[in-house]
């Protein structure tokens, strides 16, 4: 049987740890095959009756800012998510108000816009490295052996095209 232990969480935005005064209610990290990883953070934030929302009004969770979530035991934390903040919203209930922070992996940029490209005399691995590199992401692509005479990316996002080729 597992022994009980103290779970710890650390959240960095823009490389800076968030203040300890922020009351984190929950963290959800989703990593699924063929999907963009995501994370959702819930914080207790402010009082609706006074219209004060300390965390939401701060610059800690501005959309577009980089975020890193680390989880572990007894402050021995490991990174479980790195990405960007895509939205934050306040949900007001009768008894409390919560700040909801939605995050996505940086690969979310590959889903924006449909593109048309022509690749000639390249391997699938070379095409993938080129597309991933053009999006400013780190890449680790296993080399393929077959040279393809021509490959066309027609009216599809880089993400969808890579999923079809992988």
Q: Can you say where each PLM-predicted feature lies in the sequence?
A:
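Juxtamembrane "anchor/assembly" segments of surface/extracellular structural proteins
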Residues: 1-66, 102-110, 126, 142-144
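A broad structural signal for short, well-ordered beta-strand segments within beta-sheet-rich domains
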Residues: 21-26, 85-87, 148-149
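Edge/loop elements at the starts and ends of beta-strands within beta-rich repeat scaffolds
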Residues: 32-35, 76, 94-96, 137
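Catalytic cores of large soluble enzymes that bind and process phosphate-bearing ligands
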Residues: 33, 59-61, 73, 77, ...
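Short beta-strand and beta-hairpin "edge-sheet" elements
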Residues: 73-103
């Amino acid at each position: 049987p597992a022994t009980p232990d103290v779970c710890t969480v650390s959240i960095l935005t823009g490389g800076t740890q968030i203040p300890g005064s922020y009351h984190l209610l929950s963290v959800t990290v989703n990593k699924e095959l063929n999907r963009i990883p995501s994370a959702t953070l819930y914080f207790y934030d402010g009082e609706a009756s006074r219209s004060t929302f300390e965390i939401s009004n701060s610059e800690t969770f501005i959309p577009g800012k980089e975020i890193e979530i680390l989880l572990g035991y007894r402050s021995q934390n490991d990174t479980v998510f790195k990405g960007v903040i895509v939205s934050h919203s306040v949900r007001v209930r009768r008894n409390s108000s919560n700040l909801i922070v939605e995050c996505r992996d940086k690969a979310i940029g590959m889903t924006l816009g449909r593109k048309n490209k022509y690749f000639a005399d390249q391997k699938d691995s070379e095409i993938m490295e080129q597309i991933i590199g053009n999006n400013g992401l780190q890449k680790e692509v296993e080399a393929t052996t077959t040279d393809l005479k021509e490959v066309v990316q027609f009216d599809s996002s880089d993400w969808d095209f890579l999923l079809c080729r992988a």
